[in-house]
A protein has these predicted regions:
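N-terminal maturation segment of proteins
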Residues: 1-258
């Protein structure tokens, strides 16, 4: 729900298209004629599926994580709407927030006690998920590839660690200790944004100098994520605009709020 509204109400989306968020709100809350509240439909669907014998139950860790992040994203809906020029959304938005909060309580009381505590999937489902991502190798082949890749990266870290230790004046060159100490020197807030922008300017210069690819006329866009966006995706990523009917919307790099 949060991701859908955030995409629709992006500042690059024309106001005429953003108006559809008001229609969507009424449909989600069941206020539109012929529609039931989205949360009630979700309850019915989950209840229906849980009664099927032999069906794999959801993983407890995933459900718990969703329950912890949901309140942040529910509150984040307010900021998404407030950042637009839309009017007349508050009553329906308040209702949606109440419905989503009640739904979370229902999940905690009804679904969470009936979850599985092992994240492992049956082999068939695991292979199916791999194929959905275009991976045809067997799990055993992937394990071998991963082990070789890990050893290669470890060897590179062992070679680089002494150089980093010398530059940072560390009293150890063990790559594990070097990584631990680097993690204590994280950059936060405005300093992080400044670092990202400076690095992107350097990358743009190198790409242009070497003629690697064509670049847009304007600099790359980067911004700090909101608390709700960070809860949804707590890692740096690129927000790709729609490919169909794009009216000049640009991709934007999103930096998590840490």
């Amino acid at each position: 729900v949060f991701a859908g509204f955030r995409g629709l109400l992006d500042k690059q989306v024309p106001i005429e298209r953003q108006q559809q968020a008001l229609v969507r709100l009424k449909k989600y809350t069941g206020q539109a004629e012929g529609y039931e509240p989205l949360t009630e439909l979700a309850k019915l669907r989950l209840t229906e599926r849980s009664e099927i014998p032999g069906l794999i139950k959801p993983f407890a860790g995933e459900v718990q994580q969703d329950l912890e992040r949901s309140p942040i994203m529910i509150e984040g809906l307010q900021g998404v709407f407030e950042a637009t020029e839309l009017e007349g959304y508050q009553e329906d938005l308040d209702l949606l927030k109440v419905q989503l909060t009640a739904y979370n309580s229902w999940v905690e009381e009804t679904i969470l006690p009936n979850t599985r505590y092992s994240a492992a999937l049956p082999r068939e489902l695991y292979e199916l998920q791999l194929k959905n991502y275009g991976v045809d190798d067997s799990p055993e082949a992937l394990i071998r590839t991963g082990q070789v890749g890990f050893m290669n990266i470890r060897n590179e870290m062992m070679a680089l660690a002494p150089l980093v230790a010398q530059q940072k004046s560390y009293d150890t060159s063990d790559y594990r200790e070097v990584i631990k100490r680097l993690k204590t020197e994280q950059v936060h807030g405005d300093e992080l944004m400044a670092s990202y922008r400076e690095t992107m300017r350097e990358l743009d210069f190198i790409i242009g100098r070497e003629g690697l690819v064509s670049l847009p006329d304007e600099p790359a866009r980067v911004r700090m994520a909101t608390a709700a966006e960070t809860a949804q995706q707590p890692a740096a990523h690129i927000d790709i605009p729609r490919l169909v009917c794009n009216t000049g919307e640009f991709p934007e790099f999103i930096v998590p709020k840490i």
